Amino acid sequence: VTAVDYSTKMLEEVRRNLETEGLKAELHQMDVQSLEFADNSFDAVVSRNVFWNLEHADKAYEEAYRVLKKDGILILEDGNYYRRFFSDKYQKAYDEFQRGHEKEEQGCHARHNKENVDFSIMDEIAKKLPMSQVDRPDWDFNKLVETGFHKIQVEISGSPLPMSFCIVAQKG
């Protein structure tokens, strides 16, 4: 198992979690948009909540394809977390969700905000990110086809609009 993250703090967290669970993995600090691994290195690439915050998600898909062995699998979990800033229909769905859960502590941020993080900072960053401006997973599907992936399966969560999704794709 090999783990990659751009943030050294996240890698420290991974290291602690591995130690707690008695597991081992190689940890590397690098940019998924420019991986330092040789071609055809991995059987699988797994990504969770990474692509939404990339400047060049297309390059990250190309890199995943490059480092996967033939018939290797990409598993991606991601979402349209900040699409509401650029889409009226997403903003409307977000507002309706918020109204329906005013008295509950809902959402990932509310459930996991252990240090009183000011999420308005993340909102401002997300407004500048290109993936907040595209309809996903449609964009991802088209990019995967263009990159050479096949046997692409998409599972969407969220109603009435896709808020999060999981994609499994195979290298041709």
Indicate residue ranges for each PLM-predicted region.
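C-terminal alpha-helical "lid/dimerization" subdomain adjacent to the S-adenosyl-L-methionine
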Residues: 77-160
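A short acidic, Gly/Pro-enriched loop at the edge of an enzyme's catalytic core
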Residues: 33-44
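A short glycine-rich, Lys/Arg-flanked "PGG" loop and its adjoining helix->strand segment in the class I
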Residues: 58-73
